[in-house]
């Protein structure tokens, strides 16, 4: 650990201490899905299905938002999403069906520190636990580290939301700790678990994602041959 002229330990100097960029992208193209900047005109009809018409009410338990009660409420929400630059919202289009089956966002965007959080994840049942869902996360990670030049990618969740925590760990996020009494929402107290990926970890994670997503990693029934952790 380097020392300053007072003989105090300090963090390592950075070769590049510049600010990162704000997200500004229309399309990230993958093999199984595309990640598209969310717009009402392009995505409202498909999103309405899993946000309202056939929404799973339990999906909203750990979200700050409540379930939608009308089509108009969904439209208003998506109009707000489209205009927002922090969070910056995306739709996930499944290539097999051609339908938008999920949304997520880059949030808590801090260009000065080159730090950003993945959040607001809502996936239709047809997208959950699929290659397309994993590829969508990979595409956005790649964009964050390689195009935006960020150093830190965060994932936070209610400490009781085990599916979210398990997803973070599977995707390669490292558990950092728990913020107790971190938030109040829906009349409840929330302890928040924090996870992250940092830029030095990205090259190995990228290799792991690409090995897992390769067509030869799946059999004729679409079952994986090696888990993401083992790739």
Residue spans of the language-model regions?
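GNAT-family acyltransferases
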Residues: 1-130, 143, 188-193, 197-231
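Glycine-rich acyl-CoA binding loop
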Residues: 133
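Conserved GNAT acetyl-CoA-binding A-motif
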Residues: 146-156
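Conserved beta-strand-loop-alpha-helix junction that forms the acyl-donor binding cleft
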Residues: 155-164
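Conserved active-site tyrosine of GNAT-family acetyltransferases
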Residues: 167-168, 195
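Conserved catalytic-core motifs of GNAT/GCN5-like acyltransferases
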Residues: 174-188
